[in-house]
Swiss-Prot record:
Transmembrane segments: none
Name of the protein in its database record: GTPase Obg
Binding site for Mg(2+): S172, T192
Chain's role: An essential GTPase which binds GTP, GDP and possibly (p)ppGpp with moderate affinity, with high nucleotide exchange rates and a fairly low GTP hydrolysis rate. Plays a role in control of the cell cycle, stress response, ribosome biogenesis and in those bacteria that undergo differentiation, in morphogenesis control.
Cellular component terms per the entry's GO annotation: cytoplasm
Residues at which GTP binds: 165-172, 190-194, 212-215, 282-285, 310-312
SUPFAM superfamilies: Obg GTP-binding protein C-terminal domain, Obg GTP-binding protein N-terminal domain, P-loop containing nucleoside triphosphate hydrolases
Gene transcribed to yield this protein: obg
Length: 424
């Protein structure tokens, strides 16, 4: 089975907690703080590997979690960072956030890497909190939780040329003739249910990769007949060979077939519909082909190059292959995804809302990535930790927002699942 989609969960390692410790030193209160920082959590990293062909491995393992950082220790000893987790995926995989649909990466080269989940930073030890007014702090931080997200992986085959058309028009026979690919061939619809790749080698030493895309039907752009799964693999091709049963042996009109598939490509992606196309008029060895070829040429000959061929006898295939090879250098490779790193950073930095305040029954509920991170990193079992958290709420404007909403002594506040009681 050819697995070209997978949904998985990834999580970076949590940061290690900072330590509360004091060294023994004469004339220094409590010996002076010496708690080290926690180590950073490991990252989850995807690496493109040309040796992998499908996403089948992700069918059996769906959760990937990097190691957490070690906790800090006394004597200003920092915790060791967690080990990164490297996950190999096939070249040609597009990585999406499954919850938002955002494209995170498009891995098209062997060895290309992308971090899909960062590890959390280590919590600061109490040595970091010493100041002129607090010579012996007893506060430290928990480690920051690692990033976590659900990912959708989509494998889009890397091919220069894509063979498209209705089922049973001869695409598999053509690819078996012009390359070493050995697809399953039979005289019934949907013989090909997975894409086949073949390398076409020319006499002058040049070569290109061709993909036999499983047969499309009307409504493919809506998913009919596994259309979405099949059309996905045409997105990377630079040149499309639209194969027609020019003899009409399936009692279909080849001109109408061309128009239907062209419309399916347009409905799926306008950029795909604009891709250069060569028309392959196959089955020229069957009676009725000449008449249909003449009619097709009259209708489409001015806009498209038409190549009459017979996959059964091999007639016309050499001319087709060399025409494709000649056209390819002039056609730029399509780009599925280009990430503007600077723009991405600016977007992240300019988030308009630092927190949100709502009411749920008797609770005031405060939510937001920043404040929730502070909750997770605060050691509430230490008085200094609670005092510091109160100062954070004040600095972020949360205290003022709660007062404006009419909070009173004894009211309940919930942040990141933890409940607090409001006091003066």
């Amino acid at each position: 089975m050819f697995y070209d989609q997978a949904k998985i969960y990834v999580k970076g390692g949590d940061g290690g907690a900072g330590a509360v410790a004091f060294r023994r030193e004469k004339y220094v209160p409590e010996g002076g703080p010496s708690g080290g920082d926690g180590g950073r959590g490991g990252k989850v990293i995807f690496i493109a590997d040309e040796g992998l062909r499908t996403l089948v491995d992700f069918r059996y393992k769906r959760h990937y979690k990097a190691d957490r950082g070690e906790h800090g220790q006394g004597k200003n000893m920092h915790g060791k960072s967690g080990e990164d987790m490297s996950v190999r995926i096939p070249v040609g995989t597009v990585v999406k956030d499954a919850d938002t649909g955002e494209i995170l990466a498009d891995l098209i080269e062997h060895g290309q890497k992308v971090v899909v989940a960062n590890g959390g930073r280590g919590g600061r030890g109490n040595a970091r909190f010493m100041s002129n007014t607090n010579k012996a702090p007893t506060v430290a931080e928990n480690g920051e939780p690692g990033e976590e997200r659900n990912l959708l992986l989509e494998l889009k085959l890397l091919a220069d040329v894509g063979l498209v058309g209705f089922p049973n028009v001869g695409k598999s026979t053509i690819i078996s003739r012009i390359s070493a690919a050995k697809p399953k061939i039979a005289d019934y619809h949907f013989t090909t249910l997975v894409p086949n790749l073949g390398v076409v080698e020319l006499e002058d030493g040049e070569s290109f990769v061709v993909a036999d895309i499983p047969g499309l039907i009307e409504g493919a752009h809506t998913g009919a007949g596994l259309g979405h799964e099949f059309l996905r693999h045409t997105e990377r091709t630079r040149l499309i060979l639209h194969v027609l049963d020019i003899a009409g042996s399936e009692e279909r009109d080849p001109l109408e077939d061309f128009q239907i598939i062209a419309e399916e490509l347009r409905q799926y992606s306008q950029e795909l519909a604009n891709r250069p196309i060569l028309i392959v008029a196959n089955k020229m060895d069957i009676p009725g082909a000449e008449e249909n070829l003449q009619r097709l040429t009259e209708k489409l000959g001015e806009d498209y190059r038409i190549f009459p061929v017979s996959a059964a006898t091999g007639e016309g295939l050499k001319e087709l292959v060399y025409a494709a090879a000649k056209a390819l250098p002039e056609i730029p490779a399509p780009q599925i995804f280009v990430r503007d790193e600077e723009q991405h950073k600016l977007t992240q930095a300019s988030a308009p809302h630092r927190f949100e305040l709502t009411r749920e029954g008797d609770f005031f509920v405060v939510s937001g990535k920043e404040v929730e991170k502070h909750v997770q990193m605060t050691m509430f079992d230490r008085e200094d930790g609670l005092y510091r958290f109160q100062n954070i709420l004040k600095a972020m404007g949360i205290e003022r927002a709660l007062l404006d909403e009419g909070i009173k002594v004894g009211d309940k506040v919930r942040i990141a699942g933890i409940e607090f009681e409001w006091e003066e």
